[in-house]
Curated annotation (Swiss-Prot):
GO terms for molecular function: ATP binding; hydrolase activity. The gene is actbc. It comes from Takifugu rubripes (Japanese pufferfish). Actin is a highly conserved protein that polymerizes to produce filaments that form cross-linked networks in the cytoplasm of cells. Actin exists in both monomeric (G-actin) and polymeric (F-actin) forms, both forms playing key functions, such as cell motility and contraction. In addition to their role in the cytoplasmic cytoskeleton, G- and F-actin also localize in the nucleus, and regulate gene transcription and motility and repair of damaged DNA. This is Actin, cytoplasmic 3. It catalyses: ATP + H2O = ADP + phosphate + H(+).
Length: 375
């Protein structure tokens, strides 16, 4: 591998795609992982209407489009749309020729094997990349926090997982996955706002609700007490202006929405909350390393950006763990992008250069090479 060629780092999230160059401290391009197609027939000739739009352009034209996310729960469900997103990433956002740069991609742990094989195939066959690698998202977040041991609770738009890592190795038997993340919280907020009399139904309106969620929601330290405060006074109410100028008021929904992370029963799910999942993940590890995991619990991903989430995690895990245990929740301010930052660090390490899967290796072995070289 030539040193002068910059590697590309692409973190394909269910909600946002983060892309840029290895060695940079932040992604150059961050755009929604959305492909939009017109809902109506184009009647004006020469408008340059396209049959599909990607990312921010799809977002800005959402009023006339049907929006689809090709990645659901961290798994690519629509490869044609995914290819459009990658094409957009390379040619429109980063403005690079993918055949000239090694590409580091990311994926959720416990993904189906076929998913990474197909990613590998598209990179080499459609985009002709000289080399590529697929890394596990949570491991990259830990790199970004400067640790080699810890448990990462990574929660994005599509999937949440807890990954214990010891001396740089992920412990696969103790990885737990929870299909409850940002998109489910957005849907839940749509539902509870509807109960308040505000109707949000279309894919375009869902994006408005996502914005409300990102701007106004927070995690309560004590849910019952917060509910009592909300019902007795209007101190927790906030207003939000919709695109048409209408102003809506939102009260206990602000903390009821993210509370579902701790009480998935709110969404009709039988799974454990993020605090219990983190605890269960630690308990699946060897008794000798648990202390190090409790003391290095790292939050990562956009769904961990709610104010109050770290304090609440601290409180909940302290209640579950042995009473003498030191518990430390690490919530770096840049955690929204820590997967990408970790990828940027990894791809620029000199020791990593022999880890790339080269085009030649791919031609010799086919897509299954990815399981041998990436773990």
């Amino acid at each position: 591998m030539e040193d002068e060629v910059a590697s590309l780092v692409v973190d394909n999230g269910s909600g946002m795609c983060k892309a840029g160059f290895a060695g940079d401290d932040a992604p150059r391009a961050v755009f929604p992982s959305i492909v939009g197609r017109p809902r109506h027939q184009g009647v004006m000739v020469g408008m340059g209407q396209k049959d599909s739009y990607v990312g921010d352009e799809a977002q800005s034209k959402r009023g006339i489009l049907t929006l689809k996310y090709p990645i659901e729960h961290g798994i690519v469900t629509n490869w044609d749309d995914m290819e459009k997103i990658w094409h957009h990433t390379f040619y429109n956002e980063l403005r690079v020729a993918p055949e000239e740069h090694p590409v580091l991609l990311t994926e959720a742990p416990l993904n189906p094997k076929a998913n990474r094989e197909k990613m590998t195939q598209i990179m080499f066959e459609t985009f002709n990349t000289p080399a590529m690698y697929v890394a596990i998202q949570a491991v990259l977040s830990l790199y970004a926090s400067g640790r080699t041991t810890g448990i990462v609770m990574d929660s994005g738009d599509g999937v949440t997982h807890t990954v214990p890592i010891y001396e740089g190795y992920a412990l696969p038997h103790a990885i737990l996955r929870l299909d409850l993340a940002g998109r489910d919280l957005t849907d839940y907020l749509m539902k509870i706002l509807t109960e308040r009399g505000y109707s949000f139904t279309t894919t375009a309106e869902r994006e408005i609700v996502r914005d409300i969620k990102e701007k106004l929601c927070y995690v309560a330290l004590d849910f019952e007490q917060e509910m009592a405060t909300a019902s007795s006074s209007s101190s927790l109410e906030k207003s939000y202006e919709l695109p048409d100028g209408q102003v809506i008021t939102i009260g206990n929904e602000r903390f009821r929405c993210p509370e579902a992370l701790f009480q998935p029963s709110f969404l009709g799910m039988e799974s454990s909350g993020i605090h219990e999942t983190t605890y269960n993940s630690i308990m699946k590890c060897d008794v000798d390393i648990r202390k190090d995991l409790y003391a290095n619990t790292v939050l990562s991903g956009g769904t961990t950006m709610y104010p109050g989430i770290a304090d609440r995690m601290q409180k909940e895990i302290t209640a579950l763990a042995p009473s003498t245990m030191k518990i430390k929740i690490i919530a770096p301010p840049e955690r929204k992008y820590s997967v990408w930052i970790g990828g940027s660090i990894l791809a620029s390490l000199s020791t990593f250069q022999q880890m790339w899967i080269s085009k030649q290796e791919y031609d010799e072995s086919g897509p299954s090479i990815v399981h041998r070289k990436c773990f």
